[in-house]
Structures are given as structure tokens and as C-alpha cells.
């Protein structure tokens, strides 16, 4: 496949830079207004792809993402509503979880891609999951759960891990490697990341 541009439709430039690092290729920022439905992460990603795909040309591809963070103590809440839930702050989240007693948590990243194949748009979704537990935060944060999330088998929070180690084990790293392998197999990128 002769490739055109690869776009990432997101409002979060940090996510854009992380995906660029994983895919080791140029990715342009697609600035479009998207509505976000309620539901499972994969359905949200599929809906985002439906909104972004009409903006690409036949040689282009577009990537979208969704992240969920589920607390076992809260029956899987906040899940895909993590961005809104974080507005109460990581300190308050810790206090709630500590009262209930179950500190288990799961982070999931779902990455979707839309591209043309034989004149038709093809859409695929790849997910990565990271299990861990919640700990008391060193500081209160209202934008990232990495300050309170310790991946299983590690001693420190995800946010403080060395970048190489975090990328190797993180939910976004797992999803990105699957996406990269797919993109390489379709000739969308020549090589893929770690």
C-alpha cells in the first residue's frame, strides 16, 4: 500500500506524542469535533472512527483512542468515564477506595484505525490491559490516574516509572504494539515500535 498521511484524532496532545513514539512514524494531529457516546470502550472507539474516517483520503489512515480505568471496589466504575471522575482528584479517589478496602484496578487503552483497502474503509480496534492497585498519591491530580496506579509486579506508580519500562508494560504500550504490527502488515508503516 502506498501511504499518504497518518492522522490521530484527539484533543490530548500528550496521547498524540505517545503514539508517535510507539509507531516511530510521522503522525498529524486531526482537529475535529467528535461526540462521544456512552458504552464500552471498543464501541466508543468504533463511533470515533465513524466520525473521523470521512475526513481521510484513500491513501490516508486515521487513529483514535479511548482509555478506561476500572476500580474493583466500585464495581468497575469509573471505566470509560475516568476523565470526568478524575475531576474529584486522585486524593479523593484514594480515600474512597481505602474506605471500601479493595484496591484492585485495571487500565485499558483501545486504539482504533480506519484506512482504505480495495476502495473500502476498513476499521480495526486494538486493546491493551494493565492490572494493578491503587495507592495513596504523593500529590493530588485531576487529570491522570498514573499517580495512584501501581501495576501488578511493580513497586512504584505508573507515572514515576522510567519511560522505557512504562512503555513496555502499559495498557497504551500493549495496544500500540498491536496497532503497529497491524499497520506494518498492511504497509501503512514500514516498521513498528518496541
From Swiss-Prot:
Looking up SUPFAM superfamilies in the UniProt record yields: ITPase-like
Which GO biological-process labels does this protein carry?
nucleoside triphosphate catabolic process; nucleotide metabolic process
EC number of the protein: 3.6.1.66
- Per UniProt, ITP binds at 10-15, 48, 66-67, 83, 166, 171-172
Q: What is the annotated localization of this protein?
A: Cytoplasm; Nucleus
Q: How is the cofactor bound?
A: Binds 1 divalent metal cation per subunit; can use either Mg(2+) or Mn(2+).
Which class of enzymes does this protein belong to? hydrolase
Q: Which reaction does it catalyse?
A: ITP + H2O = IMP + diphosphate + H(+); dITP + H2O = dIMP + diphosphate + H(+); XTP + H2O = XMP + diphosphate + H(+)
Which keywords appear in this protein's UniProt record, sorted alphabetically? Cytoplasm, Hydrolase, Magnesium, Manganese, Metal-binding, Nucleotide metabolism, Nucleotide-binding, Nucleus
Which GO terms of the molecular function aspect are on file?
dITP diphosphatase activity; ITP diphosphatase activity; metal ion binding; nucleotide binding; XTP diphosphatase activity
Q: What is its main location?
A: cytoplasm
Q: Where does Mg(2+) bind?
A: 36
What this protein needs as a cofactor is:
Mg(2+); Mn(2+)
Q: Which InterPro entries is this protein grouped with?
A: ITPase-like_fam, RdgB/HAM1
The record's note on quaternary structure and interaction partners says: Homodimer.
Family, per entry: Belongs to the HAM1 NTPase family.
What's the name of the protein? Answer: Inosine triphosphate pyrophosphatase
- Protein species of origin: Encephalitozoon intestinalis (strain ATCC 50506) (Microsporidian parasite)
